[in-house]
């Protein structure tokens, strides 16, 4: 059986931290920002952690 390939799209969107959690960027923060308030745009530029229910799936995709 051949080796599993990592999912190239997932590798560009998610990063594994040193503690084993998975980081992601928030959506809706790249354009059309003129109608979003400053507090929201600041929050959208911060990265966050992936939910624990999806973490195992994403790790399998990026660390394969």
From Swiss-Prot:
Disulfide bonds: none annotated. The lineage of its organism: Bacteria, Pseudomonadati, Chlorobiota, Chlorobiia, Chlorobiales. Belongs to the bacterial ribosomal protein bL35 family. One of its GO terms (cellular component) is cytosolic large ribosomal subunit. HAMAP family: Ribosomal_bL35. Keywords: Ribonucleoprotein, Ribosomal protein. One of its GO terms (molecular function) is structural constituent of ribosome. This is Large ribosomal subunit protein bL35.
């Amino acid at each position: 059986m051949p080796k599993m390939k990592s999912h190239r799209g997932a590798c560009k969107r998610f990063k594994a931290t040193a503690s084993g959690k998975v980081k992601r960027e928030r959506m809706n923060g790249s354009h059309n920002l003129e109608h979003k308030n400053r507090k929201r745009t600041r929050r959208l530029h911060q990265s966050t952690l992936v939910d624990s229910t999806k973490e195992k799936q994403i790790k399998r995709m990026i660390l394969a």
